[in-house]
Amino acid sequence: MTEPLKPRIDFDGPLEVEQNPKFRAQQTFDENQAQNFAPATLDEAQEEEGQVEAVMDAALRPKRSLWRKMVMGGLALFGASVVGQGVQWTMNAWQTQDWVALGGCAAGALIIGAGVGSVVTEWRRLWRLRQRAHERDEARDLLHSHGTGKGRAFCEKLAQQAGIDQSHPALQRWYASIHETQNDREVVSLYAHLVQPVLDAQARREISRSAAESTLMIAVSPLALVDMAFIAWRNLRLINRIATLYGIELGYYSRLRLFKLVLLNIAFAGASELVREVGMDWMSQDLAARLSTRAAQGIGAGLLTARLGIKAMELCRPLPWIDDDKPRLGDFRRQLIGQVKETLQKGKTPSEK
């Protein structure tokens, strides 16, 4: 049985000719071009972030200078001399049965012991603050690693430092999501998306509340000196609370070091970021025409507090920012503007009545 013939098919266009890939011609550089050659620069944001990290690392590391070694050696020698003299006085007082001198030696020993204990405690807290930077570097390495076996232990250590209980729902979801076939990058990424946002949300609430209090205080208070003292106290308290949320216990010197790092981070990042995030939006809304001078100053103080909180959050956070989850000033700006407007409207309503 023969099959029927198929109808003829006519093509309007010409047949496509097979095109071979074209390669670029070979380029050679002479000696003058080689001398003037400049490699391509990285993205400005990445370069700025790398410079900031380098500055933070240099600030956290103590400078091993000759003068520092001489001062430390002198203090150690003085401490040994004080201890030796105290032991000699104690022995002489015991032999001569001078109970008053013996009591004075005991009191001096207690004072010296308390001083040494406080120094050791401050050193431990300062060391813990430095370790947080190393943990952040370790987390960054794990996020680019394809190995196995280190990610889970690292994340469990972070959860323990932050005080997250094993029965916490977020930690339970993380345990249910990981398995043995996942590498360290996947395990740490799951922790960053399931557990870390719990602490970040608490830090955001602290920043939002402190920024709102600073804004309203400046907007309604007529005393500039009181405003400055209040803002300074609130900013220090905000940094302490953020550090506590992320499992860092601050002492006197570690608190000063963290506050110095926050200010250094803000100064090094420059005012361009502040202008980029806030300036254009302020110009579009024409806030200068809508708000009073005190209200505008209050918003500025609130944004400064928010910026301090964001930088403190960045320095105390054990993980680097992933997928652009870093909080921005714009996240707090609308809330501050709305609160100031609401406060001004409440102040005008009784006077109108």
Swiss-Prot record:
Residues 91-99, 234-353 are cytoplasmic. The chain crosses the membrane at residues 70-90, 100-120, 213-233. It comes from the Bacteria. GO terms for cellular component: plasma membrane. Keywords: Cell inner membrane, Cell membrane, Membrane, Transmembrane, Transmembrane helix. It is a multi-pass membrane protein. Pfam families: DUF697. Its main location: membrane. Residues 1-69, 121-212 are periplasmic. The keyword Transferase does not apply. It is found in: Cell inner membrane. HAMAP family: UPF0283 (MF_01085). Belongs to the UPF0283 family. This is UPF0283 membrane protein YcjF.
